[in-house]
């Protein structure tokens, strides 16, 4: 497929999740409606991950595409109908007998994802070592956490040009090369094992104390080495605390098998969130999630959340922006050369600020222009003028004077306060 056809096929999937309720805004949001180029809801401005959107198949396609053309193809299966790679995530179902008064019932727990190991007891141990609120039990807070992290850590628009907004053929080609590079140099999936299992494979892989590669002179020397291996102290690469031999540890092949992590410590070095499904990116002796690895390699547009592959972009408020995406967060008007105000780290044009965000003067009850000086006390504001910042009793100007605030009113003296009480 040539680049022109790829560009034509691009689309952000605006029908996906349409009308889904917002888990954060509740009834304040009319339902999810994707903005035409931002990755947020047009109604409430929250991301798709904050909405109750059923995405299991879509997320499996996304992760499947991530693993395509890598050594992790065993984790994907291609659909016969269209050849789309699908992530074969490991689902674990545990059954526990529960004693009742008359008979024994079975309590079933389904994990929406579990480490793909043959030893189910090891997988179960791994889950128990995660914080309860992050265990991906179906229908739980942990399952919602996993869903949110899949969206946040592995954005589809960081690997698939068709999920991006109006890329040029040159940008598509550059993005494809970037994705190919990180798949071959940084992408990995954690491996759950017992520390002693890796130790048994020998010092050539583990590079641990006691790993003398010289040939022993006698059988007694070999026995000493064996005893030394048994006394090996394992410590977590993240928290540096010791690990128990019988507890599962996570290894990352790209980091080398001399490093291991507690299950709860296998986190992104930037956002410190659990690496979802143990999918990691390794760079400069650090673990990253997909998002923050890409951020370390390319600028990201604060408007559309996509990586910037264009040579021309703008920087404002310590953030990067596509030239066409440095827009008002409320009305999408372009802000180049215009006055704007930052509201919750988002740029807003002056008219929208006055209309939607400006504080109201307690004196004249009009919105306070962002360029005008004001006086603020607690949650109350006034124009810093002789017409507005006045004693609520005698109308004396209080600019530069001591005053007594009382529930939105200000007084120049105790006497004036008493007259109004």
Swiss-Prot record:
Keyword Lyase part of the UniProt annotation: no
MF annotations from Gene Ontology: cadherin binding; RNA binding; zinc ion binding
Keyword match Kinase: no
Protein name: Testin
Subunit organization: Interacts via LIM domain 1 with ZYX. Interacts (via LIM domain 3) with ENAH and VASP. Interacts with ALKBH4, talin, actin, alpha-actinin, GRIP1 and PXN. Interacts (via LIM domain 2) with ACTL7A (via N-terminus). Heterodimer with ACTL7A; the heterodimer interacts with ENAH to form a heterotrimer.
Family in the record: Belongs to the prickle / espinas / testin family.
Keywords assigned: Cell junction, Cytoplasm, LIM domain, Metal-binding, Repeat, Zinc
SMART domains from the UniProt entry: LIM
Classification via InterPro entries: LIM1_Testin (IPR034958), LIM2_Testin (IPR034959), LIM3_Testin (IPR034960), PET_domain (IPR010442), PET_testin (IPR033724), Pk/Esn/Tes (IPR047120), Znf_LIM (IPR001781)
Lineage start: Eukaryota, Metazoa, Chordata, Craniata, Vertebrata
GO biological process, any: negative regulation of cell population proliferation
């Amino acid at each position: 497929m040539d680049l022109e056809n790829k560009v034509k096929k691009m689309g952000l999937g605006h029908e996906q999740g349409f009308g889904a309720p917002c888990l954060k805004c509740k009834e304040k949001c009319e339902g999810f409606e994707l903005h035409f180029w931002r990755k947020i809801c047009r109604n409430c401005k929250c991301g798709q991950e904050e909405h109750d959107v059923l995405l299991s198949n879509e997320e499996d396609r996304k992760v499947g595409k991530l693993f395509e053309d890598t050594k992790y193809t065993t984790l994907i299966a291609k659909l016969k109908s269209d050849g789309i790679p699908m992530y074969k995530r490991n689902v674990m179902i545990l059954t526990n007998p529960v004693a009742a008064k008359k008979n024994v019932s079975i309590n079933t727990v389904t994990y929406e994802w579990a480490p793909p190991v043959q030893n189910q007891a090891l997988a179960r141990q791994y889950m128990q070592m995660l914080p309860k609120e992050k265990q991906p039990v179906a229908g739980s807070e942990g399952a919602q956490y996993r869903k949110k992290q899949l969206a946040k850590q592995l954005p589809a628009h960081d690997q698939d040009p068709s999920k991006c907004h109006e890329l040029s053929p040159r940008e598509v080609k550059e993005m494809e090369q970037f994705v190919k590079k990180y798949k071959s140099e940084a992408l990995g999936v954690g491996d759950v094992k017992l520390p002693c299992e890796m130790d048994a494979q020998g010092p050539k892989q583990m590079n641990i104390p006691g790993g003398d590669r010289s040939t022993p002179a006698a059988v007694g020397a070999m026995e000493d080495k064996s005893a030394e291996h048994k006394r090996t102290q394992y410590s977590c690469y993240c928290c540096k605390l010791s690990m128990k031999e019988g507890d599962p540890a996570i290894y990352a092949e790209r980091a080398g098998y001399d490093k291991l992590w507690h299950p709860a410590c296998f986190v992104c070095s930037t956002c410190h969130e659990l690496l979802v499904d143990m999918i990691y990116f390794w760079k400069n002796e650090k673990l990253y999630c997909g998002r923050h690895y890409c951020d370390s390699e390319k600028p990201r547009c604060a408007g559309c959340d996509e990586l910037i592959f264009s040579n021309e972009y703008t920087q404002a408020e310590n953030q990067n922006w596509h030239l066409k995406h440095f827009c008002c967060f409320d009305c999408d008007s372009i802000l180049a050369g215009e006055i704007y105000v930052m509201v919750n780290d988002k740029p807003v044009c002056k008219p929208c600020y006055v209309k939607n965000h400006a504080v109201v003067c307690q004196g004249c009850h009009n919105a306070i222009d962002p360029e005008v000086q004001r006086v603020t006390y607690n949650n109350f504001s006034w124009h810093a003028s002789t017409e507005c910042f006045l004693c609520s009793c005698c109308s004396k100007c209080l600019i530069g004077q001591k005053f007594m605030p009382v529930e939105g009113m200000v007084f120049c003296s105790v006497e004036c306060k008493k007259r109004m009480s």
